[in-house]
Curated annotation (Swiss-Prot):
Protein name (Swiss-Prot/TrEMBL): Oxysterols receptor LXR-beta
CDD domains linked: NR_LBD_LXR
All copies of domain NR LBD, residue ranges: 208-446
Organism: Rattus norvegicus (Rat)
UniProtKB keywords: Activator, DNA-binding, Isopeptide bond, Metal-binding, Nucleus, Receptor, Transcription, Transcription regulation, Ubl conjugation, Zinc, Zinc-finger
Biased segments, Low complexity type: 1-28, 175-196
Amino acid sequence: MSSPTSSLDTPLPGNGSPQPSTSSTSPTIKEEGQETDPPPGSEGSSSAYIVVILEPEDEPERKRKKGPAPKMLGHELCRVCGDKASGFHYNVLSCEGCKGFFRRSVVHGGAGRYACRGSGTCQMDAFMRRKCQLCRLRKCKEAGMREQCVLSEEQIRKKKIQKQQQQQPPPPTEPASGSSARPAASPGTSEASSQGSGEGEGIQLTAAQELMIQQLVAAQLQCNKRSFSDQPKVTPWPLGADPQSRDARQQRFAHFTELAIISVQEIVDFAKQVPGFLQLGREDQIALLKASTIEIMLLETARRYNHETECITFLKDFTYSKDDFHRAGLQVEFINPIFEFSRAMRRLGLDDAEYALLIAINIFSADRPNVQEPSRVEALQQPYVEALLSYTRIKRPQDQLRFPRMLMKLVSLRTLSSVHSEQVFALRLQDKKLPPLLSEIWDVHE
């Protein structure tokens, strides 16, 4: 396997290349304003690590407003400038002026042209918003406006055409002609989503579903890019040394656990951007993440499986065979099911939108342990199930079993999750201690 050096999303203790030891693989997860690494052994507090990485990074509030916008009372104020708000725009309660300003800034790249004559910390109000565009854009982002919610001119044009087509009366049917109307393609999704006829005839994604899919795919891309930039500090895979030596075995184990930490952090970052997740209470957020993380990791592993080489590639170019997994300390009883599941997922041929929707459905599983509001979780899951059903019927209208096959993979993941628990127990018997974040999210009690 290739073994370039790599990096964690959160710096490892020591601010240098990690060594193949237990403490070196522990992530440094800082609270806001905290400058020092947590002391060794600080993993004892319940859910401390998960709570910190769940905190919104760039917002003054604890939770972002997600999902359907609540009804306006008529006296709400813009979160950016304090003027009268007209509704929720780009995920934030704001006025028409700030809505239009944020859209123009994103579409026309205004951030690169704006400048502040002051210190970059101008206070925003209805007067000052016209004086300093840079600080106004900064305040928009601090309030929670999201660039991925802004549609391009082409996407808006397609939506207008689609809306006009929906308002027009349907043309008279001519069965003898054999022609069929194709559903409109979703902006931001592959053209394959509009192909086909037969059972998929007349099915279209709603505007809300299109936006949902765009947001999920964009969020995944953003999280993946962050992981790619985090390579340099992962413990290098040992090359040239005696593969059976104790140091080499420890180094391989450290390498894999650090990749797992990157994956966990990527999953948490993605979950925070899934519409509806931050509406849940903190306890339910933690419960859902603890239960779903390993299953999402396995989905992402399957996504990176190469059926020709029978290897799995993490980040940019970390490629691993079955033997590499075994050399890192994993058991054959866990490795073989991973590769079997990856091959099965490969045969389904999911695209980015389908993977993103399937992961969102997995996150909102109401039957997870310790969930306080299962009915609310189930309600949040339903739109993603409906979007995936419509999307698959549009993409593969002749394959009526595609959607149920996808959902059955979530059942397979439950079995794999149980096998993973046995693997973690086996690692403990081998006296291989997991880093605090992994111990906490997988409920490993030392």
